[in-house]
Amino acid sequence: VMKYTDVWNDLTEKMGYWVDLENPYITYENEYIETLWWILKQFHEKGLLYKGYTVQPYSPAAGTGLSSHELNQPGTYKMLKDTSIVAQFHLKRDQDHPLMDKVFENAEEDTVILAWTTTPWTLPSNCALAVGASISYVKIRTFNPYTFQPVSVILAMDLVSKYFKEEHKALPFDDYKAGDKVIPWNQVADFKGSDLVGLRYHQLMPYVSNADLEKNAFRVIPADFVTTEDGTGIVHTASVFGADDFRAARENNVPSVMITDEKGNELPLVDKQGRFVQEVSDFAGRFVKEEYYSDEERKDPDFRPTDVLIAIKLKEDNKAFDVKKYEHSYPHCWRTDKPVLYYPLDSWFIKTTAVKDRLVELNKTINWKPESTGTGRFGNWLENLVDWNLSRSRYWGTPLPIWRTVDGAEEKCIGSVEGLRLEIKKAVAAGFMDASFEINDMHRPYVDDVILVSKSGKKMIRETDLIDVWFDSGAMPYAQWGLPPTAEGKSGNISPEAFLEYWNKHTGSDSEPGSIYPADFIAEGVDQTRGWFFTLHAIGVMLHDSISFKNVVSNGLVLDKNGNKMSKRLGNAADPFETIEKYGADPT
């Protein structure tokens, strides 16, 4: 980690960057990590730290979940051309529903509900179809454009013109022949979304089924996020791969399409590498996103993305009504540049929404330059705040300082090295730890060897997650100093106010005490409004109801010759070592 310290120190001096090179803070040192633990313990005691099972942004390429502020870094959303599908969900005849006479007007009629998706790989996990209760829907008699079979389709009235031409309306059905480009259609019924709720349909891609799914899934549910801006006005719902889907399914008691492993754990149909599981037999082992394949694999003339193969299968099975390429903005991992998935994970969260109003209020006291960045980009971000996903499934970084019993009924959050050693002594007395064990490094794997004892005498194992590196950054105003070398400080029982009081007293002089917090001034690029600026602000407000900086200058981004953001990762940045050598520090 410190291999190039001398090189960077030399560059820093040439740039004239005013910083203490003799006493840097180093985020991997125990003293720094210990202070992060202390902050997290403060949050835990305030009820701001919790574990939840939710659908979150997840990067298969990086192997970890991502926070909302990571997903909103500049350049993370990129335009992609993906295969979109309007799928046909065939309604069941053997059901008791008030609309049955309108849905099926004769014994031969095949009636389907149309739902659009830009993520065909989620279709095997479909568990429900969501409608807007007040939206107007219609039933249209027509023919499937791929199988040429007669079909009656249900979709939103406002979106009929996306799929049907007015001049083809009411043309003679008897004149239609398989393969004709002109497809006749006719509206034969209309409904409100609330009328459709409860209708049941056949599972679209029945790779996984069980009694609970058959009884409680594959039905129409109401949802407040359904619109008629695009698609069909009916939302394909895969509860394990979308936050809105997850919420809507839970509110309507719809089970998720999952498999069960040998330990009894429920798992989605896509693994954490982004591949279909074996149960999805037609596509087992295939990556769900084209970008997860290597460049070499994608150059193969026979290569076809999984979404395309799904579209082909649905066409063959008379379950696709419209397939085309669709260009849209899609989130990518800021570390790997690969698309993310929305994925169900057990994660630890910081409840930033609990202090949202205070974050907004205190932001108005900060002097932003330009002001529009503070009121606009940063202010809007705070107004739409979600809880901070703290967990990271990685090996190197700051470990989460929480130990839990296997049943999850008891937990401890450790706030210092001394506090951990005291808990280890209790575990030794309980027979869970060897008396000779010493903790000298707070990283994995050493910290994972620590077993603690609960109040009821049960074993407690550390939660295996690390914490978001942006927490490391946002905690810098405190962690750069470490816990005060007092009994109260070393035990981790010091209050935030006492922490600042101690370091203010010991960083100045007798005649002029120091003032370590809040910072008088910080400066960074506009991309940090949802990065460092946010984490500084959030931690400061949650820890002791204060801003972290009084003044901030937020500059724009230096772009390359093509107008793209310069990035070390992309290799399009000007090399400062070369430019300083050639032109000197000032021009650079």
Where are these regions (language model features)?
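Conserved core architecture of multi-subunit DNA-directed RNA polymerases
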Residues: 6-13, 34, 38-42, 70-72, ...
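Non-cofactor substrate-recognition interfaces
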Residues: 1-22, 101-107, 111-113, 120-588
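Gly/Thr-rich phosphate-binding loop signature of adenosyl cofactor/nucleotide-binding cores
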Residues: 47
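Metal-dependent nucleotidyl/phosphoryl-transfer cores and adjacent nucleic-acid-binding surfaces
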Residues: 43, 80-83, 132
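Active-site cores that bind ATP or allylic diphosphates and position pyrophosphate for catalysis
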Residues: 57-114, 122
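Charged, gly/pro-enriched flexible loop segments at helix/strand junctions
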Residues: 51-59, 394-400
